[in-house]
Regions:
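Short beta-to-alpha transition helix within the HATPase_c
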Residues: 3-21, 25, 49-51
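Conserved glycine-/histidine-rich ATP-lid loop and adjacent helix of the Bergerat-fold HATPase_c
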Residues: 118-127
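Short conserved segment of the HATPase_c
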Residues: 87-100, 104
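Acidic ATP/Mg2+-coordinating residue in the GHKL
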Residues: 82
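Short beta-strand/loop element within the Bergerat-fold HATPase_c
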Residues: 64-74
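Conserved short strand/loop->alpha-helix "switch" segment adjacent to the catalytic nucleotide/phosphoryl-transfer site
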Residues: 30-49
Length: 155
């Protein structure tokens, strides 16, 4: 999987496929019709970073994970949304810091926040902008990963 080239869509589809083999949840991957697809190197940091966020969506979703990929002539973006409870308000402004733990939360789904911290750090070191927020269209969490195409092509 590593040290070849592929498109963002292929990155995401390969990661989603690995989760579909072990998860009962439904993954819905959509590609913008305007997508300007180009190949980029398969880097372990990108694989782990994207995988961490898709894994979190799988962990906290009730039934579905929505992934939207789009690229125009300037930017490329992966949006990952779930239908879970979303980020607790008490940690929302601290998402991405290590060891963040919510005071509120499902006891079965507690974590130290290291997955988000690691995923965000790996992607940002590869010139991505990562935004973690509660979804504006669904009940759950949303992660938006954006690159300038010039940065993505020069990884």
């Amino acid at each position: 999987f590593i040290n070849t080239e592929c498109s963002l869509e292929e990155y995401v589809n390969e990661i989603v496929k690995s989760f579909e083999e072990i998860s009962k949840k439904k993954f819905i991957v959509n590609l913008s019709q305007d997508t300007n697809s180009f190949n980029i190197p398969k880097l372990i940091e990108l694989v782990y970073g994207i995988r961490n966020f898709i894994g979190n969506a799988n962990k906290f979703s009730k039934e579905k994970i929505y992934i939207f990929i789009k690229s125009d002539n300037k930017l490329s973006e992966i949006s990952i949304e779930d239908d879970g409870p979303g980020y607790p308000k008490d940690i929302l402004n601290k998402i991405g810091e290590p060891y963040i733990k919510s005071e509120i939360g499902n006891q079965n789904q507690k974590g130290l926040g290291l997955g988000i911290f690691i995923g965000k750090t790996l992607l940002e070191r590869n010139r991505a902008k990562v935004i973690c927020r509660n979804s504006q269209t669904r009940s759950g969490a949303e992660v938006v990963i954006t690159w300038k195409n010039t940065d993505l092509k020069n990884l």
